[in-house]
């Protein structure tokens, strides 16, 4: 992959009942980024989401449910001719503790239905993922209710700190300095 990020999408489910849930931490990331950049996210039906143009890159918060996120990402990417390698997806990551944040280049969906749908709609897995740790409930049968509930106060504070850490590295992501971002986040 080469070049910098031209599209940043933050995954989550629409609606107030999901806004504070663990599954929406990608949307938390995107909303905070838009606020920091003084951008208003405007609803764009053709992109199935809320969108803002931020200098040389786009912000996207899908209005689809998580497992249909690919509709929004692919619609905006195709319209603006953004390659998968120029896309960053911010999402919740069960396999990391709350407070961890890591950048991953390409790969599979790891059981994440939002990523699975994005791969399907793009026809490629060659995009970047900003994986925001939310902890794991310990048992597979508890995952759905866990991700659809709010984090504990301690976990929420750790998640917000991880988001801030990721937001500080947006300039490097846009410039394509992915190795620097990985060094910063993974050390």
Swiss-Prot record:
Annotated site residue numbers, Stabilizes the basic form of H active site to accept a proton: 92
Primary localisation category: cytoplasm
Binding sites annotated in the UniProt record for tRNA: 18, 65, 67, 113
Bridged cysteine pairs (disulfide): none
Molecular function via GO: peptidyl-tRNA hydrolase activity; tRNA binding
Coiled coil region boundaries: none
UniProt catalytic activity: an N-acyl-L-alpha-aminoacyl-tRNA + H2O = an N-acyl-L-amino acid + a tRNA + H(+)
Gene Ontology BP terms: protein quality control for misfolded or incompletely synthesized proteins; rescue of stalled ribosome
A GO-annotated cellular component: cytoplasm
Active site: 23 (proton acceptor)
Keywords: Cytoplasm, Hydrolase, RNA-binding, tRNA-binding
A Pfam family it matches: Pept_tRNA_hydro
Marked site (Discriminates between blocked and unblocked aminoacyl-tRNA) residue numbers: 13
InterPro entries assigned to the protein according to its UniProt record, in alphabetical order: Pept_tRNA_hydro, Pept_tRNA_hydro_CS, Pept_tRNA_hydro_sf
Enzyme class: hydrolase
Keyword Hydrolase included in the entry's annotation: yes
EC number of the protein: 3.1.1.29
Entry's localization field: Cytoplasm
Keyword RNA-binding attributed: yes
Subunit structure: Monomer.
Main function: Hydrolyzes ribosome-free peptidyl-tRNAs (with 1 or more amino acids incorporated), which drop off the ribosome during protein synthesis, or as a result of ribosome stalling.
Family: Belongs to the PTH family.
Name by which UniProt lists this protein: Peptidyl-tRNA hydrolase
Organism: Coxiella burnetii (strain CbuK_Q154)
